[in-house]
Swiss-Prot record:
Belongs to the methylthiotransferase family. RimO subfamily. Its EC number is 2.8.4.4. Binds 2 [4Fe-4S] clusters. One cluster is coordinated with 3 cysteines and an exchangeable S-adenosyl-L-methionine. The gene is rimO. It comes from Thermus thermophilus (strain ATCC 27634 / DSM 579 / HB8). Its main location: cytoplasm. This is Ribosomal protein uS12 methylthiotransferase RimO.
């Protein structure tokens, strides 16, 4: 049977694309190979968001060519085929992000499909995450025009899925053991705008392609629902009642990017120091236990020490639960590249280190507030007898902290258990099964 090697790079949205490609390949009768040597062809799903990601993608393509020789490239970097051909002219085919059919066509040119999918039962969806959690993509593309970002050029304008289609996928996942649904998009709050928030039928029930209505129906499935990448203004307030009612996890991933109003204007992003703090205060009044994650860019062109200090002051006062930080990296094709006053690399790195040092203090302070409390933990791993590693509502897989739990030895992966917190580190918690 024909074997395909597969490498998936980039964000959770790219991971969903990889799962779709692998599921379709499985339906056509292909097997996946864990090694380059055993595979008859390798697919590389690339990332092209920042220069470091581009370089990593090009290096992986080169490695696959060296070890295997037959490579099909897809994903965000595939939207810039000249970049790939310049370094690796021998790749078999290049497709852009989300172009599943073109990937399948490219594979079948080299390796004809082992079977006719119309004559066989379609196998279950291939998942690249553990069985108990899954990413569900609500939309593709983005209509925002942030000056530092080229996602609209790579992935196109906003294209939302019908609500019934999303709910059907979520229901299938929950029926097969998924305990946590992580909803992803470039901007979840824009979901359905391109569809005019039209209705579709889920069973015999009409559901609007609008985030609040979708979530209200999805909550009936009983899984944890976690939201990633929600534009900060103005839609967050509409989602808070669902969190207060326990229908959606009280967790928000809101990329604020900066706190200096001047820098945010250059980024073409909304808000600033005062408006950010006002919004956070209003959200926490509705959902006091709300966990907030955000990402920030330091060293953006024109960022002065004063601008950076505004960001530090904001983080001290905002007390965000989780923070990611990037030193600004010029992305080929981004409008921000034309801005004057670039920040020297050593200054970018120094500011990044200062921000992380401050946030580490904030994170420890926040974590220590949970000592003595009992939290619900979703078990991810059982590394040894009597020990479990899991996550609370505050922790998204792979990017946030974890909870190390002393257990009675009977818990299973995917189970939700009460845990009494005994100790807190900067990013992680330690406790005992209650």
């Amino acid at each position: 049977m024909a074997k395909i090697g597969f490498v998936s790079l980039g964000c959770p949205k790219a991971l969903v694309d990889s799962e779709q490609i692998l599921s379709r390949l499985k339906a056509l009768g292909y097997e996946t190979s864990p090694s380059y040597e055993e595979a008859e062809l390798v697919i590389v799903n690339t990332c092209g968001f920042i220069n470091e990601a581009v370089e990593e993608s090009l290096e992986v393509i080169g490695e696959a060519l060296k070890e295997n020789g037959k490579v099909v490239v897809t994903g965000c970097l595939g939207a810039r085929p000249e970049k790939i051909r310049e370094r690796h002219p021998q790749v078999l085919a290049i497709t852009g992000p989300g172009e599943v059919e073109r990937v399948l066509e490219a594979v079948q040119v080299v390796l004809p499909a082992p079977r006719d999918p119309f004559l066989d039962l379609i196998p279950p969806q291939v998942k690249l995450t553990p069985r108990h959690y899954a990413y569900v993509k609500l939309s593709e593309g983005c209509d925002h025009r942030c000056s530092f970002c080229i996602i609209p050029k790579l992935r196109g304008r906003l294209r939302s899925r019908d609500a019934a289609d999303v709910l059907a996928e979520a229901a299938r996942l929950v029926a097969t053991g998924t305990k946590e649904l992580l909803l992803v998009a470039q901007d979840l709050s824009a979901y359905g705008v391109d569809l005019g928030h039209r209705e579709s039928l889920w069973g015999d029930r009409p559901v609007r392609a609008e985030l609040k209505d979708l979530l209200a129906h999805m909550a009936e499935l009983g899984a944890w629902i976690r939201l990633h990448y929600v534009y900060p203004y103005p839609h967050v307030k509409d989602l808070l009642p669902l969190m207060a009612e326990g229908k959606v996890l009280p967790y928000l991933d809101v990329p604020l990017q900066h706190a200096s109003p001047r820098i945010l204007r250059l980024m073409r992003r909304p808000g600033g120091y005062e408006s950010h703090l006002k919004a956070l205060k209003a959200w926490r009044e509705v959902v006091p236990e709300l966990a907030l994650r955000s990402t920030f860019i330091v060293g953006f062109p024109g960022e002065t020490e004063e601008d950076f200090q505004i960001l530090l002051d904001f983080l001290e006062e905002a007390e965000l639960d989780r923070v990611g930080v990037f030193a600004y990296s010029p992305v080929e094709g981004a409008e921000a590249n034309r801005l004057p006053d670039p920040v020297p690399e050593e200054v970018k790195e120094e500011r990044k280190a200062r921000l992380l040092e401050l946030q580490a203090r904030v994170s420890l302070r926040k974590n220590q507030r949970f000592v003595g409390k009992t939290l619900e933990v979703l078990v991810d791993e059982l590394p040894e007898p009597g020990l479990a590693v899991g996550r609370t509502y505050r922790d998204s897989p792979g990017i946030d902290g974890v909870v190390y739990v002393e257990t009675d030895g009977t818990v299973r992966v995917g189970e939700r258990i009460p845990v009494r917190i005994l100790r807190a580190d900067t990013y992680d918690l330690h406790g005992v099964q209650a």
